[in-house]
Structures are given as C-alpha cells and as structure tokens.
Amino acid sequence: MASTTFSSAFSILSLPSSSPSPPPWAPRTLPVANRRRRAAAVASTVTESPKVLELGDAIAGLTLEEARNLVDHLQERLCVSAASFPPAAAGLRAAAVEEAPVEQTEFDVVIEEVPSSARIATIKIVRALTNLALKEAKDLIEGLPKKLKEAVSKDEAEEAKKQLEGVGAKVSIA
C-alpha cells in the first residue's frame, strides 16, 4: 500500500516542468513574483542545485494528503519514525522556563556610610549581629562600604538594616 501512496504522492514530481498550466487537481500556488522573491532569498543564502530547488518547489506544491503520504513513505523507507525525534516545542518551553525571573532568596547587608557621631553605637550593633571582636568590628566600620552579612534571608537582612539605620548608619541590601 505504501508504494501506491508513494507513487501518488510523487506523481506531481514527475510532471514535466515545461507544462503550460497545472492540472485542475493541483493545489494553488503563490504568484510567480512571490516564488521568484522566495527563490532569490534562498539562493542568496545557500547555493543549491537546480534539482534541489525543483524538488523543493514540487514538495511545497503538495496537498496535505500528498504530504502526509510522502512523510509515511519516507519514514518507512528510511526506517525512522516521528517519535524518534524530540518535539520542537520542548525547546521553546525550556527557553521560556529559563527566562522566568528567579526570585532572590539570599541577600547581602552592606554598610554604605556611618556618620562619625554614630560610630560607637554602630560598632556595638555590628558586634551583636556578627559576633566579631571589638577591633574587627572597628576595622569593618572604617573601610566602608563593606558587606556586613552575606547570603542571609530577607527577614534577617531587613532586621539588620533596621537596627543599623536606627543608630544612624546608611545600609543597603543587595
């Protein structure tokens, strides 16, 4: 049965190219000007043999029934199936998943500036938040801007910011 469908599917391919008009059962095609533009666009990007172009035009002119028969025949002849190929939409869905914005779960608390009148109070808060020694907390305050805490939760970062801004420090969460 496949050979009969194959012969009917390729009957359009065996038509002489010099026929003045297509048979009445042939599908409607694009106007000649559009085909020429399309062929020129293809020819400008890839150099193809006239045989390939003729075959491509013939396949493009197939009806849906003939195209389905052609696919069935080629699958049988080449021993492949449509199931052996991954679906094209899977790649699009994967790209859409990658583009989804990732919500930040870890934050850094950065001390931007400490006024000189609030240095002692800020050092006390820094020591309470980080368990640093007095000298290390003082060194942290002197070389600003510096990260006070890294990779903490949003609640913990907001709480540290609130305490530091309460004593007069300028703090940002990154």
Curated annotation (Swiss-Prot):
Give the subcellular location: Plastid, Chloroplast
Q: List the disulfide bonds.
A: none
Any GO BP annotation:
translation
What the entry lists under SUPFAM superfamilies is as follows: ClpS-like, Ribosomal protein L7/12, oligomerisation (N-terminal) domain
One Pfam match, given by its short name, reads: Ribosomal_L12
Q: Name one GO cellular component term.
A: ribonucleoprotein complex
Q: Which GO terms describe its molecular function?
A: mRNA binding; structural constituent of ribosome
Q: Which InterPro entries match?
A: Ribosomal_bL12 (IPR000206), Ribosomal_bL12_C (IPR013823), Ribosomal_bL12_C/ClpS-like (IPR014719), Ribosomal_bL12_oligo (IPR008932), Ribosomal_bL12_oligo_N_sf (IPR036235)
The transit peptide of this chain lies at 1-45
Its keywords, alphabetically, are: Chloroplast, Plastid, Ribonucleoprotein, Ribosomal protein, Transit peptide
Q: Which family does it belong to?
A: Belongs to the bacterial ribosomal protein bL12 family.
> What is the designated name of this protein?
Large ribosomal subunit protein bL12cy
Supply the gene name.
Answer: RPL12-2
